[in-house]
Amino acid sequence: MANIKSQIKRNRQNEKRRLRNKSVKSSLKTAIRKFHEAAETGDVEKATVLMRDAARKLDKAASKGVIHANQAANRKSAIAKRVASFSA
């Protein structure tokens, strides 16, 4: 346990941020998982809608600093490539 006032405050802030980041990451994983499930079943329209939702959540997570911008770009690219493979 910290004794210094500023460190006690820093611990409080870190805990708040950790919980917020955990929530964002969880919803991100859920969105991507739902996309993959739709892609597995071959439902192109549903997968396309879920791809947009997942891409939006990836962008938000990157802008909030929860994940790195390059990681968001790589994941968006992977799901976009999977949607493109439906039409090819």
Swiss-Prot record:
One GO term describing the cellular component: cytosol
Family according to the record: Belongs to the bacterial ribosomal protein bS20 family.
Gene3D superfamilies, per the entry: Ribosomal protein S20 (1.20.58.110)
Cited PANTHER family: 30S RIBOSOMAL PROTEIN S20, SMALL RIBOSOMAL SUBUNIT PROTEIN BS20C
Biased composition (Basic residues): 7-23
Organism: Salinispora tropica (strain ATCC BAA-916 / DSM 44818 / JCM 13857 / NBRC 105044 / CNB-440)
Origin: domain of life: Bacteria
Role of this protein: Binds directly to 16S ribosomal RNA.
Protein name, as recorded: Small ribosomal subunit protein bS20
Region (Disordered): 1-28
GO biological process: translation
Key words, A-Z: Ribonucleoprotein, Ribosomal protein, RNA-binding, rRNA-binding
Example GO molecular function: small ribosomal subunit rRNA binding
Source organism phylogeny: Bacteria, Bacillati, Actinomycetota, Actinomycetes, Micromonosporales
